[in-house]
From Swiss-Prot:
InterPro entries: UPF0231 (IPR008249). This is UPF0231 protein Ent638_0667. Pfam families: UPF0231 (PF06062). NCBIfam families: PRK05248.1-1, PRK05248.1-3. It comes from the Bacteria. Belongs to the UPF0231 family.
Amino acid sequence: MDYEFLRDITGGVKVRMSMGHEVVGHWFNEEVKENLALLDEVEQAARTIKGSERSWQRIGHEYTLWMDGEEVMVRANQMEISGDEMEEGMSYYDEESFSLCGVEDFLQVVKAYREFMQQK
């Protein structure tokens, strides 16, 4: 899972992820938006559920983050739309709407994001 951090012209941090993990970058860009308290919450949840059968979920405005002791799932909330609501011939490009990755890999991105934020 490759990633890149960039600053836009306003100084805001943007995350770009490798193919297949784009939605993780969207989660950082749309839900985190430099809110380190949210990252604290995610890291605390990861510590709490590690080695257990429990899971944790955070539903955001655009994306939902779900994790258990082994993997993290990020999915666009729009995926809740049933097929009946879609126009004929239309479908979602799911690669940018859903992603799975390991908890440790995800936490590495969180750590790198924090470090990049401190470089202001």
